[in-house]
């Protein structure tokens, strides 16, 4: 489908690399939306941000987590990637460890040097990490990370069937709830680490900040994205979740569409739900799905309108796959 917006994007010269302005949200698949709403509000302390039929968003610390039912797409039962991490301080690390236990959520606390960490999953299987880089007094009691000489982490054991009617039923309403400080990172699987590093730095404008032993981190628009070839999975070919959304300002939106296409990235058409916001989907070379989101752009009046919003534009997610130079 050709639109005025797509033609305009293709005509923009790439004289200056456009930039994302921040991370908008991380949208995850879930098995049961009602169960997930209970988990993200009660256990994760999320604040309801947006809800429509079949989709809900919670604000947790400084990030929005979206949820929608899908047949698969969460972290594999034995996998470490993808996972999503939150910062918290030492006091809240201890509180959160006890909080997860009270809500019958299996978890694995461990340490890497002076950083205390906990892995756990939501009821669907999406893997989360808590990250406390200082101030946890009980750090010496935690087992070492596997790559520091500790035991292997049994990620399969962290899967569970959540009895949300029972879990947390005995919690004193006056008990202090843990607080997460900020979103720390999203760590994603990639098939080719060198290729992924080039894509995230050269195309998405990220800064390589860590690179060791099959794992790298790139800071993009203030958010850390981890990249690894260790066991994991990407967004499925025909799936919308998980996906990772970056903000773009109005002046950068169409230039970014052009920039992505000029760098060999297959994208959807710029589209809109309401004639005000601008949206675009694309994948990294491994297949992880990303969204570009502009809160308000005049050009949206000419963008294709989504079919669910009364328009005739349907996204072909499978068509976003492409081969990028390795």
Where are these regions (language model features)?
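Conserved acetyl-CoA-binding loop of GNAT-fold acetyltransferases
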Residues: 42-48, 105, 203-208, 265
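Conserved small-residue-rich
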Residues: 29, 40, 174-219, 223-225
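Hydrophobic, helix-prone linear segments
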Residues: 1-64, 71-72, 184
